[in-house]
UniProtKB/Swiss-Prot annotation:
Compositional bias ranges of the Basic residues kind: 272-281, 535-560
InterPro entries in the cross-refs: EF-hand-dom_pair (IPR011992), EH_dom (IPR000261)
Coiled coil start-end: none
The protein, known as: Increased rDNA silencing protein 4
PROSITE patterns listed in its UniProt record: EH (PS50031)
Protein family membership: Belongs to the IRS4 family.
Organism: Pyricularia oryzae (strain 70-15 / ATCC MYA-4617 / FGSC 8958) (Rice blast fungus)
SUPFAM superfamilies documented for this protein: EF-hand (SSF47473)
GO terms classed as biological process: lipid metabolic process
Amino acid composition bias (Low complexity), ranges on this chain: 65-76, 130-145, 384-402, 426-445
Keyword Lipid metabolism attributed: yes
Biased composition (Polar residues): 14-25, 97-110, 311-324
CDD domains per record: EH (cd00052)
Amino acid sequence: MTIMTSPAHRPPASSLSIPHEQAQSAALKGASLAFQKQLDASKKKASPPGPNHNNKLTTDPRGGALVAATSAASLSNQTTGGSSVADHHHGVPEHATLSSRLAQLQQRSGSPHLRPPGNAGGPRSASFIAATLAASRSTSPSPSRKNSVVTPQEQRRRAGAHSRASSVGSLRLTSPSNLGPSPGQGVDYGGYDGEDDADLDHDEDTGFRRLGRRKVVAETPTLPAREQSRRRDGDPVKSPSPVRDTEVPQPRRKVIDRVPEQEEPASPVQKPRPKPKPKPKPKPEKIIKTEPRAAPEPVESKRAEQYPGSEPTSPSIRRASVQQPKPKVARAQPARTPIKAYHSQKEIQVLSRILMPKDVDDIDCGPLTLDGAHGPPFRERVDSISSDDTFFSTSSGQGRRAPTPPPPRRIRSVRETPSRPHSEATTPSSQQRSTSSQSKQTPTSANRSSLALDSLTNAIVASSLASARHTPASRSQTPAPVPVPSRKRNDRLASNLTGGGMSRSHSRSPPKKQGMLTTLRAPHSKSDDEEARKHKERHRKRGPLGGKKHVHHEGSRRRWRDSVTAEERRRYEALWASNRGLLLPPKDGGVGQQHQQQQPEDLVANVVVRDLWSRSRLPHDELAEVWDLVDLGRRGSLSKEEFVVGMWLIDMRLRGRKIPPRVSQSVWDSVKGLRVPAPA
């Protein structure tokens, strides 16, 4: 029958912890007697080396004892693995597992012969278990233990220590590196170095001494039962060879189950492999502070990725790993201190990165003084090397203090915290650890972020208060820009209402009216016409002292001009020169007639005059009236003077004046000018 205890059939923790002292003393005495018997049997008959799955043979003369020890440990782990893992899961100590295992062995019906190790379903005798556990001592790699003669007293002491620690050692295999063979053996366990076996032996020795310091030595009534079972099994213990090959991967499952328990002790100093101190009493204070930081599930997954060879190979182990829940941390047991120091450094860096984002690193880390100015930045000061204990004291001490420190002190402590990742991130070892420990801090970020949020809030409030105290001084030094335009508006409104600021408003008005004036105008003429004079008066009356009373000048205006200005005459003569002689044939005659009559080259035809005058858009009757006034020769064409006077009359009509009934002589004289007769 297979003895597999599950959490449902496991006896309660109280019943297991009662016969603890009795079970340990029974294991001591039974193991010592069985070890003496096993030594006598090993001298007579040596077991042959067994084959290995890796096609390697064991050549060590201690191979028989080693195979027996490993087979017994494998069978013990296979049959009682459920109860041990379940005990750790429910928080039952390891001595309860030891007592429960011995109680189960006493209740079984012993058989006089040893079953083969492949058939783990039947009962086993107590002497076989004690002998095989005691024989595991022979796996030590030290040469002094190979060749030295063992006295009976040393045999009893070693057998008692191994009987107490082997059940614990089945669960407490600290890392996959401890599964390697001894230097004298040729068995390959998956590529691990053989020197790690010395660490396993060293850890077992330290575990034996700690268990021995508990002074749990008492007489037990179960000794006669164990001696009877030993007498019943009269045959010497033989170590079966093929069991090692099939059951070797079994302790690898226990490595994974044991890993979360190693996360408890924290040692700030990193050394290659230091021996644990005999009294680790002052360290559990820091361990209690850092307990919520350990997350068993991410560590287990991380260890599985880091050591791919630690995956179980047998089907029973795989089934147990799927069905069994992940164990919780039962108690703090300092073992493998370099691993924990490695883990604590990762915790420090990831905690600081989770609590303080990148924006906080960009902030100047100088302390905020009461003057509103930042002091020297702390980044230069934090570059000096500081221990990990200082970081734990600043982070965990905030939640432990009852009185709240003053705001500047808390600002300083908070600003030192984000600068910690800068000093640690410079080392290459911390950069390698940060990548593998990102998944550990997810459950602890909420606890730590509350403290950091409180500290950051106090820092922000203090900085805002300090800046608010000094803003009135800066405002008083610089004038406020808002009241200045309001005073200008008030002065402008008052000047418009009272009329006192006329000169100011008057000086600004001309650009507005000048913008509406036409720029394409003829230059100012010297004529005395009404419009030219009005144009002058319009610009003249806008002086610095204002306009005059009688702006229209009713009595001083002139009625009619009776002369053509020289400027107007030049403009009209240019138009005549460009259109003369058009559509007129030349005339032949005597010299006297040519002198008396105008030449056709100096005349402008009536059709051409009509076309030019019609561009003024005056009515045809008015244009006909002007034609009658200027056509003196009645020949159907106009000379130079006639054409100029006709153009002048049309312009006067366009300016608003009426066409006169006759043209005065002064107008004709202004047009003719000085004439020089042609030479004969």
